[in-house]
Amino acid sequence: IGRLVKAGKITSIEEIYTFSLPIKEPEIVDKLLPELKEEVMQVFPVQKQTTAGQRTRFKAFVAVGDCNGHVGLGSKCAKEVAGAIRGAILVAKMSVVPVRRGYWGDNAGNVHTVPVKVTGKCGSVRVRLIPAPRGTGIVASPVLKKLLTLAGIDDVYTSSRGHTRTLGNSIKACFAALKHTYSYYTPNFWHNTCTEQIPYQRFTDFLSKEMKAKEY
């Protein structure tokens, strides 16, 4: 995928999502979504008991999104805060997913909320996203509000259950709910069948060429 994106054969990230291809390089997302924004959700110390004593590291949760239907979430542990944040950003970029948006009531104007009720879970936490009328805003906790804003959701009600004080699980549950917006078919999608070949087949000749190593 990286070679096809670099050569300009794949120009939209939707082509990758259509065939459910894995994104294994953050540079792919940098090229296809240059307007991504980054937001640090939480940084906290974690400890591990060893024979030499307690070993303290830092864990960071970072969300990325373009506020237009694409969002990713990543976490990383490192000895230093800066290293944990940098690693979490790379993981978040490789986990970017599309978010399906819709309307509450009539289909006037731009999409502004989730199309149906969706639920995500992680551990004991359950987060439910409920469509809201235009002008409501994001009714959620401050951390979840950041994630929903990066996803491009303008109006939504949220309901959470479980041990929501575990902030990492709350963030993951909300991200899972956003992923579930594309886990079902509605009648307006029934006629859209994909008849294209997978990019690996379309560009077989290009991929079969041997890459020459640069000489310095």
Label every model-predicted segment.
Residues 2-216:
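Ribosome-associated RNA-binding proteins
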